[in-house]
Structure formats: structure tokens, C-alpha cells
Amino acid sequence: VLSQRTDNYIFHDMSVTDIIADVFSDYGALAEFDDRTSAAYPPIEYCVQYRESDMAFVTRPMEDFGISYSFVHADGSHKLVMSDQNMQVDTVEGATRKFITLSGQDRRTEECIHHFVPERRFASGKTAWKDYNFKKPTAEMHAQKEGTASYEQAGKELYDWPGRYMELGQGQTFAQIKLEAHEAQDKRCMAAGNSPSLFAGSLMTLTDHPVGARNIEYLVLRSQHTFTSQNYRSGGSGGTDSYEGQYELIDSAIPLRPLKVTPKPVVQGPQTAFVVGKQGEEIDCDEYGRILVRFHWDRENDQSMRCRVAQNWAYKQWGGMIIPRIGMEVMVEFLDGDPDRPLVTGSVYNADAMPKYALPANKTRSTWRSNSHKSKGFNEFTFEDKTGGENVFTHAQKDHTTRVLNTRTARVDKHDVYSVGGNRSVE
């Protein structure tokens, strides 16, 4: 049912499990779940569900944080179980299943395993992430983990960018989760038998196998149950119904993490949004000049995370700084197309916020005009490029201060008009 609803929604400062619980809460009994995770998941500053189903949205962060899920079925109901350790899932009824070799038409009424084949699969044994934190621009952010597999080519590395973390410790956790997810693709066991009570996401201990090392506890990854009724076979009536089960197992001592297979939505190009902020303010920014915006697709009147604002120049105590003000329509890009990483790159006019000088009548005029904070004044710097009417105009709403550390040169080829309405002092 979660695949039947798509949404655009913003979550602020919530852990992955809290976000999932919030989504599930809209479905009532249809999304009954049991959170058995034990890890302390950090709050995520900003997480966007962007043009994706609820199912995809909750699955994606589970894969990021290494949370597995399975279902427990009962008469007339089912429950989703979330776990981040194998021991957190249920043990099957009876706990153990004997290995019994069958021959011919031999059938057993007791639940057992009669076919068991260990398999090996090639899996990468090294993972690496890298990311960048603008609050710590020189910090080491290269996270890497390596497994213990000793076979040839086991050291092939899975490297990707960005890792979507702000601290190296979190990056190391993500690298470990990714490593465990790929290592868990190896050492699977394929089994068959008469055990209809085995279900995906349960624990079972095998006994009586002639190879002693195989008599251990397993996590059931997949179970396929086939029932055949003799009453429906051609030319026959009555007879004995039969059952055959196929199971995929893994040693329960091997951490099981889901592979990252759910694609993260990609924002295709820039969007516009309106600047928002504190009630009664015109300008709302933090120490980095970051602002808040509200996207047009947002139906909850929510706001984004603090977004950095691109400037024409930016470096240590020099460069440019213009803070977009509340109500402005701004252009927003997304780093790597990630809806969780907005970046304001400019601003645009609209029908409710038109330029000072009407267009196209003043198309030769280039203007930079500000607005006095919580007032009606302005500062302005304008170039008029109309042939024969070229002009550079400046307007200071209050004071105009010029500081020259060496020589000041002024050359006027014709008239120089200097008018002072008050006092003029020369020091």
C-alpha cells in the first residue's frame, strides 16, 4: 500500500527511525510495524521526500543506515519488523530443523531439511566514501573500510561520492554498512525441505548434518513454499497432497545489511523558491549568510534547511556578500542533483516584484539598487548606456564615505558643480 502514494515532503531534525514511523503513522493498521533496532541513530538535519512513493522513501534510508526489514504474518494481519542485528528477529517454532537425507518417494511428516548446498559469490571487500563539510573545509572526510576476505580480487574497492555525511565518524559507519551489505552476498546456502514454518526474517538452527560445521544457526533470507494437491492432477482423484520448500540461508553470525538498490531522486535542473524567515524580519540569515526558502511544490508551508548563497567572490574577509531578503524569488540549484543539498545561486523578478525602471523603455540602464532595512530608503548605483545620454548615477540614502589611502585624482573636462546643503569641512 505504501507504493500507492507519492509525495513531496520535508523532514527536519529527525532520526531515520522517527522518519519511518512518521510515514507509517498515516496508514494506521495497514502499516503496523515493530522497530527492534538498537543503534543510536543521529537526527538528520534535513531529509526530503521528493517525487517518490512512501515505499521508496522509507526503504532508501533503511538501506543507507543498514536497517533490514521482514514481515511476520498472522491470521488476518501482518507486521513489518525492522532490525539492525540478526538476533533481533524471531526464531522459528521449534528452533531447530534436522537434516534428513531422503530417497525416492520418501516423505517426512516432521519438518526437516533434506537438501543443503553452500554457495560462494564474489563480493567486493573494500568500500570507500568521500564528502565535504563547508563548516570544516580542510577536514579529512575520506572514509574507508576493508573486509577480511582472503581470496584473489577481494580487495576490489567500491568508491563513491558524495557519501552524504558531515562527520568522518558517520562516514566510517556508512562505509562499514556498505562493506557488510556486500560481504553478506557471499556465503549463502541454498536448502530444500519439508519446513513450511520457515519464513524470511527468522532464525533456524540446523542439526544432524554430516558436516559438523554446517550445524549452526542460520537466518532465513528467502522462503518459497510449493503445495501440490493431487486432486487437481490430470486423470487422478484423491491422493496425497505434497509440499516442497526452497530456502535461502546465511550464517546468523554474518551481519546482514541491505544493498543500496533504491535510487535517490535526482532534481533535474534548478528550481525557484521564495525566501522565508522569522516573523517580522526582512532579512534572516546565520553566520554563514545562509537563508531559508520555501519551494513551490511544498504543500505544508514548510521551509528548507539553511541554504548557502553563491556570491560573485568569496574568500577570507574579502569578496562579495548580498543576502537575499524575505519575499524574494531565488534560483536554487542542488549539489549533485540531491534534493537534500540546496544551494541558492541567484534571484529573479516576477509579476509581483518588478524592476525599478520599467522595461523595455529603460533597457539601456544597468542598476544595482538596495532597500533600506525596514524603511523606504535606498542606495543605488546605476549605469545609463543610452548613446548621448551616458551617465553614472549614485545615490546614498544617508552617508557616503570614501577612503583613499594614497592619491586621489579627479579630472573634469567641462563643468564641475558642487553643492553643499549644510556645512563643508576640510581637515
Model segments located where?
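Short solvent-exposed strand/turn elements
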Residues: 1, 85, 232-256, 287-300, ...
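Carboxylate/His-rich catalytic cores and anion/metal-binding grooves
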Residues: 1-2, 10-15, 20, 137-143, ...
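Short helix/loop capping segments that flank catalytic or ligand/cofactor-binding pockets
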Residues: 3-5, 70, 90-93, 124-128, ...
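Second-shell loop/turn segments in exported
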Residues: 5-13, 44-48, 261, 311-312, ...
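Extended, domain-scale alpha-helical bundle/helix-rich regions
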Residues: 14-41, 45-253
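Short, solvent-exposed loop/turn positions at domain surfaces
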Residues: 185, 191-192, 261, 279, ...
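Short boundary/loop segments of OB/S1/cold-shock single-stranded nucleic-acid-binding domains
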Residues: 253-270
